[in-house]
């Protein structure tokens, strides 16, 4: 064999006379990944990285989704399937993505192109998923910002029924004259036909989704009739993007400092709100309801599905964020400890936030005389209706309201930073011209978000948001992460991946991690994908049913990100060098790595069998 140049300067490698690569490296052979990359910026400190990852993973879902899922799925017993899913899928995939980003030191697109060119489409899929999430996530932050600056008032607008949009069905919760709160008995409960001032403010006064002055909660908008733009929401969204831009335009050196506040401040507020919550009447009932175990619920597949879904959306594999953040680490950073630490913080925050939420729900049940299941809500209804209503009944209500919505803003901002950084890093590494003009690129990205976001600033904007939440994330995310696990286990090879980890940190992951990466995670992910397809239902929101066309377009939209995986794979295969299918397959399934004293990434096969798992 002799070394001959190829037409592609990035593919200089030994070849036989038929043009096929004939060089192989033993698994512990001299592959140099050039850990010192002077052109790659790095975190200015280890804590910048840890706080950025914690800030991304701990988001609004920890506050408004996990506690509700515990309540819905058997109370404390939900922690059993949740913990199992964390141990078998969440943490292993979290760890895997951090390792891949740190080893290849690039964003998702370039990293997957180097791991396995045939599956470079995984990188495009995860970037597109992060793109879809950013469309609606920052609108929720705009809502929080509106509530935050509106809270700087002696009279909170969601505490009163004296507004122009209020209906005769509106009621105001009150404290007693001596400053204490008395619990209502069942026969004193608020009528189910009544609508709280907080609910009317959110849906009628703020969003305009429900008809003003009407004594009901019927949706009056549709996806074909979104109504007028709510310019106060649009202005808030513009301010959110200004905050994001000036936090991210210079890269991780600016965002890495901002997260010192946005990642740590929520824990201060959660502690304060917990102390306040356990001083309210009825708090014990709320906590008991949150933790009361119902072991019969473990027999329901939906409980396990909810646990797995929460793990993936909470820890965040498949969004490209973990790869992007870890790509700025020192090559020999102990990402194993980082993965365990940040995963634990995330899961503990989810669990502890339940005490903050349900102590207040117990209080609301006490105040209204309604059972807790009639008070509890999931998603925006919890943080923009139920919790603000509870805070409005307390002495010094504006103070508590400012504190709560400032916490929501900080929780959401660093998660927004993560999603945007995944896109910026992924595209900048793949298209270097964007990296050279980062400030302009980031500005154009957020300007595009702002234009798209206007549709969700209309009176029916929440209908578009719900459509994006359902169709823009779940299927593409699950398919991408499933492909990630399968490629690492069965094409790239676990033995090679384990060697890469050893090269970085000096030790090999044990059999537990190999089992999770090769068996447990792919099986659970495939089960989730199958379940999502089998149990698919046409989308509804409150009493509004989405038209058939919206659901059909939604399904196409849901699969748009995942479609990049086969499309890019076909393109790579068709254009691969080689005279036979076997030669082309070898070309597109070999990882691109570096030899000693070379700067180019070249395709280098290994001698290890791809199916060799437990080694």
Swiss-Prot record:
Lineage: superkingdom: Eukaryota
Result of knocking out the encoding gene: Significantly reduces the learned avoidance of bacteria that induce mitochondrial stress.
Chain residues that bind Na(+) 1: 55, 58, 411, 414-415
Cytoplasmic side: 1-46, 101-120, 251-253, 329-334, 425-439, 489-518, 566-615
Record carries keyword Glycosyltransferase: no
Record has S-adenosyl-L-methionine as a keyword: no
Ranges in the topological domain labelled Extracellular: 73-76, 152-229, 279-302, 359-398, 461, 542-544
Record keywords, A-Z: Cell membrane, Disulfide bond, Glycoprotein, Membrane, Metal-binding, Neurotransmitter transport, Sodium, Symport, Transmembrane, Transmembrane helix, Transport
Alphabetized PROSITE patterns for the sequence: NA_NEUROTRAN_SYMP_1, NA_NEUROTRAN_SYMP_2, NA_NEUROTRAN_SYMP_3
Function text: Dopamine transporter. Terminates the action of dopamine by its high affinity sodium-dependent reuptake into presynaptic terminals. Plays a role in the learned avoidance behavior of animals exposed to food that induces mitochondrial stress.
Protein name: Sodium-dependent dopamine transporter
Biological source species: Caenorhabditis elegans
Lineage: Eukaryota, Metazoa, Ecdysozoa, Nematoda, Chromadorea
